Amino acid sequence: MVNETRTQAEPIAVIGVGSIFPGRGGNTGYWRDIFQGRDTLTETPASHWLLDDYYDANPLTPDRTYGRRGGFISPVPFDPLAFGIPPNALQQTDSAQLLALIAAKHALDDIESTSGVEIDRTRTSVMLGVASATELTAHMAGRLQRPVWVNALRQSGLGEADVQAIVKRMEDHYIEWKESTFPGLLGNVVAGRIANRLDLGGSNFVTDAACASSLSALQIALHELRAGDSDTVLAGGVDALNDILMYMCFSKTPALSPTGDCRPFSMDADGTMLGEGVGILALRRLSDAERDGNRIHA
């Protein structure tokens, strides 16, 4: 009975793709990197964190990571006005939300450019695998350490004027709390912002199943389509969290590869590697896609 049910399950088609990955980036570049067997893992760029500050080959060194390589997304141009986002809110918005917004638009554009058919956005949902933590969350938590800094400086014998001046300089390394900070750091708003800015009227939410988050989101999307609750679903995964916190977490477990290479299914495998990336698929029921003349990628 179970096998019969699986056989009769409505086939689902991929009709659009949007992606941002390390290396050559988008859909075409990502495929070329795979086809050519290109290694897109690199040393940690200074834009993320400095090796001099945090790297140590000894895994037992406190507050240091033995990982120095990973997959890092290159800077991506973002026009906030094109998405109706105030430019002065960008600092208070996590990069995962912005990158996902770009990739989602690419997926929708892919549908319209390849089939010339606009989907019904009122019945389009967004379901993404997203980690509960965001880079901005850690950043804003750091700003709240002011009392710790003040106490440490006072205990060092500094005068109050010097204490306050030094703490002010430390605070200047963190962005200020504003009205847009809370939604800007929430993981669930990765999906919510896509629905809001791209005018999608279906469900929107994220799922956190650790390393299986993307597959979890896809599974839920299939159920959504087969139940008839949505006609189109944007599903996939978003991870822009290659900050030092993640490296420290995986180093102290320890789960990171000490040799700096990911070798799945190999006898020489010695750990995992961390990589940023955004991959979003536009999914429809196969019968609907064929009826409406959508280009079917898979």
Regions found by a protein language model. Give the residues of each.
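Condensing-enzyme catalytic core of the thiolase-fold
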Residues: 2-298
